[in-house]
Swiss-Prot record:
Pfam families: Fapy_DNA_glyco (PF01149), H2TH (PF06831), zf-FPG_IleRS (PF06827). The active site is at P2, E3, K58, R265. This is Formamidopyrimidine-DNA glycosylase. One of its GO terms (biological process) is base-excision repair. InterPro entries: DNA_glyclase/AP_lyase_DNA-bd, DNA_glyclase_Znf_dom_DNA_BS, Formamido-pyr_DNA_Glyclase, FPG_cat, MutM-like_N-ter, Ribosomal_uS13-like_H2TH, Znf_DNA_glyclase/AP_lyase, Znf_FPG/IleRS. DNA binds at H95, R114. GO terms for molecular function: 8-oxo-7,8-dihydroguanine DNA N-glycosylase activity; class I DNA-(apurinic or apyrimidinic site) endonuclease activity; damaged DNA binding; zinc ion binding.
Length: 275
């Protein structure tokens, strides 16, 4: 599933190509995603100019003067950009569900083999969208700090990994990056969240920020379907220290990395290095 680094990579890829441009047409090949696409989306968007693009958690936001297009990549989604300078727009296949065509010939194509993503039109106040209004702080923002995390975990008895992946605590830290952050911070994913000391919260905050920033720099992780707006794979998976390394030697102590299920997600950790 695309997590925050993959969504941020996508944002940085599409924004320069569509900001300030006017939608000419929308081609809908498949309406049934996680939530059905409005069949009138083409009529709604045609003639509207993109003011800006942004991201909140794992949601991409395309802003117009009187509304936003909210895009979620789901389990396997990606956005590709085709420009007139490419010479030829790639021929769509059965997984290419939506094309947004701009007046200068640029095309933004949504691809989603598993169809768990979403493309939603909304004309209300952005921050009050039901999918956005209860989200926690961005992990790379100043709001996600030691004091915030320490206070937020005090009343939580559940495993710290589950708390870290809760979007009401902090957004965008999915399974891959939760595993990587906890390993690098030396904290067991099973530790009750309210047992973390303040200095451990400080280390964890710093580690989460560093892991996510590095993942963005390397274009995110491509394990199956994810590609950026140019169709290129990310390569942060080459830097994994624990995720996907069960029964392999720990890179710190040489012991075997363990894989268990926690909250229905694969959890990788070293019993020696993480306490």
């Amino acid at each position: 599933m695309p997590e925050l680094p993959e969504v941020e990579t996508t944002l940085r890829g599409i924004a320069p190509h569509i900001e300030g441009k006017t939608v000419e047409a929308v081609i809908l090949r498949q309406l049934k995603l996680r939530w059905q696409i409005n069949p009138d989306l083409g009529e709604i968007l045609s003639g509207r100019q993109v003011l800006s693009c942004g991201r909140r958690a794992k949601y991409l936001i395309v802003r117009f003067q009187t509304g936003i297009l909210l895009i979620h990549l789901g389990m396997s989604g990606s956005l590709r950009i085709f420009t007139p300078s490419d010479g030829r727009i790639g021929r769509p296949d059965r997984h290419d569900h939506v094309d947004i065509v701009f007046s200068d010939g640029t095309v933004m194509r949504y691809r989603d083999p598993r169809k768990f993503g979403a493309i939603l039109w909304y004309e209300g106040i952005e921050e009050r969208h039901p999918l956005l209004e209860k989200l926690g702080p961005e992990p790379l923002s100043e709001a996600f700090c030691t004091d915030y995390l320490y206070a937020g975990l005090k009343a939580q008895k559940r495993a710290v990994k589950l708390a870290l992946m809760d979007n009401t605590v902090v957004v965008g830290v999915g399974n891959i990056y939760a595993n990587e952050s906890l390993f690098r911070a030396g904290i067991s994913p099973h530790r009750p969240a309210n047992r973390l000391k303040k200095k451990e919260c400080a280390v964890l905050v710093e580690t989460v920020k560093a892991v996510l920033q590095r993942a963005i720099e390397t274009g995110g992780s491509t394990l199956r379907d994810f590609v950026d707006s140019d169709g290129k794979s990310g390569y942060f998976q080459q830097e994994y220290t624990v995720y996907g390394r069960h029964n392999q030697p720990c890179l710190r102590c040489g012991g075997l990395v363990v894989k268990e299920t926690l909250g229905q997600r694969g959890t990788f950790y070293c019993t020696n290095c993480q306490k």
